[in-house]
Curated annotation (Swiss-Prot):
EC code(s) of this entry: 3.1.3.-
Region annotated Disordered, chain positions: 1-21, 204-233
Oligomeric and partner information: Interacts with the ERI/DICER complex component dcr-1. Interacts with ERI/DICER complex components rrf-3 and isoform b of eri-1. Interacts with drh-3 and rde-8.
Protein family membership: Belongs to the protein-tyrosine phosphatase family. Non-receptor class dual specificity subfamily.
Name of the molecule in the record: RNA/RNP complex-1-interacting phosphatase homolog
Organism: Caenorhabditis elegans
Domain Tyrosine-protein phosphatase: 34-206
């Protein structure tokens, strides 16, 4: 579903737009592909955060580098795909208006994930897993994709998608990481996230973990009521 050919020369994509007049783009946002392809064997499609059109005012950015909610919906339609749920992992509400998803009939869930530490937040992992399970178990959502994004659609996004693939779909950590990176079009950058994914696989197999996690997963649930609150506010 990507509007770019995947390659790892993304460091050479145009830079500097974040320093132009108007709202400041997120750091390094422009160097990553807007959206990956839906991951084979799953419902997931990873993408970087869409931005409100006001972020592009005064920057004279090429249209293909601008990326908003409407852009993603259009790309999905062109690929004969339908996104039914978007899970937003950014730790801010400043990038776009969440009501835009509802305007396109897409459910929206916000999980505030601080950068660099989602692997220590087992409560967020379980919230993510529960939300995805609830969505895929509803027959009304058959065939619909689940869009997942953080700021760059890479590290927090990759970690949580891979955790679902490991914990629920029984992928090995190696396969989950490789698949995510292939379909996202970029490698995960946080080595401690990758290490934590291998630890999660070991914990699932042997019931032991040498790492630490915070949060109380026993009290962590995502319900239809929470999804409703996210989409009605």
């Amino acid at each position: 579903m990507s509007n770019y050919h995947h390659n790892h020369n993304y460091q050479h994509r145009p830079r500097g737009y974040e320093r132009l007049p108007g709202k400041r783009l997120p750091d390094r946002w422009n160097i990553y592909d807007n959206v990956g392809r839906d991951i084979d064997g799953t419902r997931f499609v990873p993408f970087k955060t869409p931005l409100d059109s006001s972020f592009f005012d005064g920057k004279n950015m090429p249209v293909e580098l601008q990326f908003g909610v409407k852009t993603l919906i259009s790309l999905a339609q062109q690929a004969n795909k339908q996104i039914g749920l978007v899970i937003d992992l950014t730790n801010t509400d400043r990038y776009y208006k969440k009501t835009e998803w509802a305007d396109h009939g897409v459910k929206y869930l916000k999980l505030n994930c601080p950068g660099h530490e989602v692997n220590e937040r087992e409560d967020l992992v379980q919230d993510f897993i529960n939300a995805v399970k609830e969505f895929v178990n509803d027959k009304e959502n058959d065939g619909k994709l689940i869009g997942v994004h953080c700021t760059h659609g890479l590290n927090r996004t990759g970690y949580l998608i891979c955790r679902y693939m490991i914990d629920v779909d029984n992928y090995s950590a190696s396969d989950a990481i490789s698949m995510f990176e292939y379909y996202r079009g970029h490698p995960m950058e946080r080595e401690h996230y990758k290490k934590s994914l291998y630890e999660a696989e070991r914990k699932k197999k042997y019931g032991k973990s040498s790492g630490k996690s915070s949060g109380n997963s026993a009290d962590s649930t995502i319900s239809s009521e929470q999804l409703h609150r996210n989409n009605s506010q």
